[in-house]
Amino acid sequence: MIRSARLISNIKFGQKNIRQFSTNTNWWANVQKGPEDPILGVSIAYNKDTSPSKINLGVGAYRDENGKPYVLDCVKKADKKIYEANVDHEYAPIVGVAAFNQLAAQLALGEECKHIKEKRIATVQSISGTGALRIAADFFARFLKGKTAYVPNPTWGNHNVIFNDAGIPVKSYGYYNPATCGLNFEAMTKDIAAAPEGSIILLHACAHNPTGVDPTAEQWKKISEICKERGHFVLFDFAYQGFASGSPEKDAAAVRMFVEDGHNIALCQSFAKNFGLYGERIGAFSILTETSDQALNVESQLKILIRPMYSNPPVYGARLVQAILKDKELTNEWRSEVKGMADRIINMREQLVKYLKKHGSTRDWSHITTQIGMFCFTGLTPEQVDRLANEYHIYLTRNGRISIAGINSTNVEYLAKAMAAVTKDN
């Protein structure tokens, strides 16, 4: 009887503990639903719309004349070469595919870059541009402690989030002038000069996102001088090489100028837009150093940082870019194709302005053609953007940014007519 009583008591005690434990399994009751990404939200609204006239001007990916995703012919040929080579699927090193890293640095900095020739550069493969920026932010948090990152106002939305998540304070410098839809160079240089010595200055190498507004060569020179005088550390976000002007060399001019001026920059590259490899998530992060020993030290620390982050990068995108850039014929084909994409975007800018005038708009839309790259800051107000969505089924972000890649010969006049209507008397 005593043993039975103890057994019953133990069972009841166990059941009580189980009940107590089960009440503690609801770990996530305090997690609230987060806000939707404002850019991705545009596509969600577009997909819900059933109108045959709908246009998505929020997507950050190139589309062909028929509004379809575009796979470059040089990528198809590189893909075929890789398949026929019957390559394995082993892990890449932590730093990624070495040949890709070398070619990526050469594409951005030029084959004659002294840092490359003298091995005064540490380059690692990254998970596209976002991954490169995250590596940069985490590295700066460890080795540029106490520094603040300065980003243009406005800038790509992920910049602030990435630096904040890495524990780096973020401030902005003047960049865009809403009155002219152009560069506020005076505010930009004033703010960069006023930043504490040794600050981190993030610059868009070309095709500024979201405005499409870039400094001139003379303005870049002045920015370089100010950064040097103030001892600032310069980080370039280089997501659109070749995609802005159609010339990889022209688009790299600012980056190469800063290096020639003596800046040991950091560089974040993406191969999503210019190679059409969005889903392959292929990028690179580089730091230029004073000596080759410093480059080795930096690389060793980057490996330590990357190992618990994602350990090893995916190899396929790197193999594609490598296959193209190491083959002269494929490289020339890529140059031709990236120019073709850039030229189509430039042409759509011109067509949009032409049709805006045709439909009676008296506003000055010249900024549409002076801005460059995939995106255009139209100057439309949030209320006008809402009207475009509600009345015309045209979707874009509420700051007035449109993706020119979403425009083609079949929808450009409809877009212009709608823009003329919502901006009438404004």
From Swiss-Prot:
Q: GO cellular-component terms in the record?
A: mitochondrial matrix; mitochondrion; plasma membrane
**Class of this enzyme:** transferase
**Molecular-function GO terms, alphabetical:** kynurenine-oxoglutarate transaminase activity; L-aspartate:2-oxoglutarate aminotransferase activity; pyridoxal phosphate binding
Chief localization: mitochondrion
Location of this chain's protein in the cell = Mitochondrion matrix; Cell membrane
| Swiss-Prot/TrEMBL catalytic activity | L-aspartate + 2-oxoglutarate = oxaloacetate + L-glutamate; L-kynurenine + 2-oxoglutarate = kynurenate + L-glutamate + H2O
**Family annotation (InterPro entries):** Aminotransferase_I/II_large (IPR004839), Asp_trans (IPR000796), NHTrfase_class1_PyrdxlP-BS (IPR004838), PyrdxlP-dep_Trfase (IPR015424), PyrdxlP-dep_Trfase_major (IPR015421), PyrdxlP-dep_Trfase_small (IPR015422)
Q: Which GO terms describe its biological process?
A: 2-oxoglutarate metabolic process; aspartate biosynthetic process; aspartate catabolic process; aspartate metabolic process; glutamate metabolic process
Names of the cofactor(s): pyridoxal 5'-phosphate
The organism's superkingdom is given as: Eukaryota
- List keywords of the entry alphabetically: Aminotransferase, Cell membrane, Membrane, Mitochondrion, Pyridoxal phosphate, Transferase, Transit peptide
Pfam families the UniProt entry points to = Aminotran_1_2
Range annotated as the organelle transit peptide: 1-29
E.C. numbers: 2.6.1.1, 2.6.1.7
Family matches, as SUPFAM superfamilies: PLP-dependent transferases
Q: Where does substrate bind?
A: 60, 156, 209, 401
Q: Which residues carry this modification: N6-(pyridoxal phosphate)lysine?
A: 273
Question: What does the function comment of this entry state?
Answer: Plays a key role in amino acid metabolism. Important for metabolite exchange between mitochondria and cytosol.
Q: Describe the subunit structure.
A: Homodimer.
**Note from the entry:** In eukaryotes there are cytoplasmic, mitochondrial and chloroplastic isozymes.
- What does the sequence similarity comment in the record state about its family? Belongs to the class-I pyridoxal-phosphate-dependent aminotransferase family.
> Which NCBIfam families does the annotation name?
PRK09257.1 (NF006719)
This one is known as Aspartate aminotransferase, mitochondrial
Source organism per entry reads Dictyostelium discoideum (Social amoeba)
